[in-house]
Curated annotation (Swiss-Prot):
Required for rescue of stalled ribosomes mediated by trans-translation. Binds to transfer-messenger RNA (tmRNA), required for stable association of tmRNA with ribosomes. tmRNA and SmpB together mimic tRNA shape, replacing the anticodon stem-loop with SmpB. tmRNA is encoded by the ssrA gene; the 2 termini fold to resemble tRNA(Ala) and it encodes a 'tag peptide', a short internal open reading frame. During trans-translation Ala-aminoacylated tmRNA acts like a tRNA, entering the A-site of stalled ribosomes, displacing the stalled mRNA. InterPro entries: SmpB (IPR023620), SsrA-bd_prot (IPR000037), SsrA-bd_prot_CS (IPR020081). The gene is smpB. Belongs to the SmpB family. It is found in: Cytoplasm. The keyword DNA repair does not apply. One of its GO terms (cellular component) is cytosol. HAMAP family: SmpB (MF_00023). This is SsrA-binding protein.
Amino acid sequence: MAKKEKPEKIICQNKTARINYFIEDTYEAGIVLAGTEVKALRDGKGNLKDSYVAVKDEEIYLYGMHIGPYSHGNISNHEPERVRKLLMHKREIRRLYGKSREKGFTLIPLKVYFNNSRIKVEIGVGRGKKLYDKREDIKLKEDRRAMERGLRSRSREG
C-alpha cells in the first residue's frame, strides 16, 4: 500500500515578503534547530518578520527569525533571535550566492513549515518593489474584489 502524503503544515509565513518584493524563484532548505526550538515551533511560536537570509563562507544562514521560548523549558532554553544555519546542497548555495550578488536581488525567507515531521524553510529570491508597484498591486486587488462582489450579488438576485 502506498504511503499517504501528509499536507505540509505551515508554522509561520512572511506575509510582507510578497508585498515588498517580486519573488523570482523559490528554494527549500532544512534548518538546524535545538530541541526546545522545535517544540516551540510545534506550539506555533515562530515569526519571520524582519528576517533575511545571507550566504557566508559557502554556508547559508537565517538572520532575525524569532522563535519564542518553549513554555515547559528550563534554564537551558534557547536564545530567541540567534542566527540559524540552513541546510542546502553546495551547488544550490552557490547558485543563491550568485543571484544575491546581482544588483537588486535579495534572499527572503517566505515560510517555515513541517514536511514529513522535518522543519523546512522556503527561501525566495526577490527584487524589491518600488512604491508605485505596491500601489498598482493594491489597485488590482481592489478591482478583483469589486468584480467578485458584483458577481456574487448578481448570482443572489437571479
